[in-house]
Design a protein with these regions (language model features):
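A conserved helix-loop-beta module that forms one wall/lid of the active-site cleft
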Residues: 70, 76-138
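A generic structural signal for alpha->beta connector loops
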Residues: 10, 28, 70-71, 97-100, ...
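CheY-like receiver
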Residues: 44-45, 92, 115, 149-152
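Internal nucleotide-binding/catalytic subdomain
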Residues: 136, 140-206
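Short glycine-rich anion-binding loops that position phosphate/pyrophosphate groups of nucleotides
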Residues: 57-59, 129-130, 175
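ATP-binding N-terminal substructure of ATP-dependent carboxylate-amine bond-forming enzymes
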Residues: 1-84, 88, 110
């Protein structure tokens, strides 16, 4: 989506990605195929671009830090690192004054047992990292086998969130340019099916 929008705006785009089914390749002006941790290819890529960004957040933080030493990475590698860890996202939101659903960090079976007691009815068990758009998460309730659900997610570090019923979901996107110009894009509304984003409409109709 970023490459398509950039192309329409007249920018030249250079895509870095592993080989595979990459939709952006049809609009990119240049393509470099490489693994996310191929540091030599990342350096070559960085030498050819003025600014680098990511279509999704789960790029290894070390790779983004390497790029940030060679070219402009936006948002910064610090922001991406926070977005990769669900518990860090929630802690940042709370620190910034936002409310979050009740949630618990699960590192071991003791954490899991303790958190179950504090969930009212339904919850969502999510991997703390590498989850994306409905992946790495399972719905659970008081009758669920929480240990089986945790095992199905690989018994990795997770967060358990209390499930809330939403009437609507809206997003407000903030931007900051390299010259420190700041602003907001129009308010948008998101529509999900089974935890996966299906459509976003902007501006939102409130």
């Amino acid at each position: 989506m970023i490459a398509m929008s950039a192309s329409k705006a007249g920018y030249k785009t250079h895509l870095y990605c592993p080989k595979g089914d990459n939709p952006a390749e049809v609009v990119a002006d240049k393509i470099t195929h490489g693994e996310w941790d191929d540091y030599n290819k990342l350096v070559e890529f960085s030498n050819d671009v003025f600014c680098a960004t990511c279509e999704f957040e789960n790029i290894p933080s070390k790779s983004l830090e390497l790029l940030s030493n060679k070219t402009n990475v936006v948002p910064s590698s610090i922001v991406f690192r926070c977005a990769q860890i669900r518990s860090k996202e929630k802690e940042m939101a709370i620190k910034s004054g936002f409310n979050t659903p009740k949630w618990f960090l699960i590192k071991n079976t003791d954490d899991l047992i303790s958190s179950i007691k504090n969930i009212a009815k339904e919850g969502i068990l999510k991997t703390n990292s590498l989850g994306y758009d409905g992946k790495g998460q399972l719905k659970v309730d008081k009758d669920s086998n929480f240990f089986e659900a945790w095992e199905n997610l690989g018994s990795v570090e997770c967060v358990l969130e209390e499930k809330l019923e939403f009437r609507r979901e809206i997003s407000l996107m903030y931007f900051k340019s390299l010259d420190d110009t700041e602003g907001f894009f129009p308010l948008s509304e998101n529509y999900h099916e089974n935890g996966i984003l299906k459509k976003t409409s902007a501006p939102a109709y409130l």
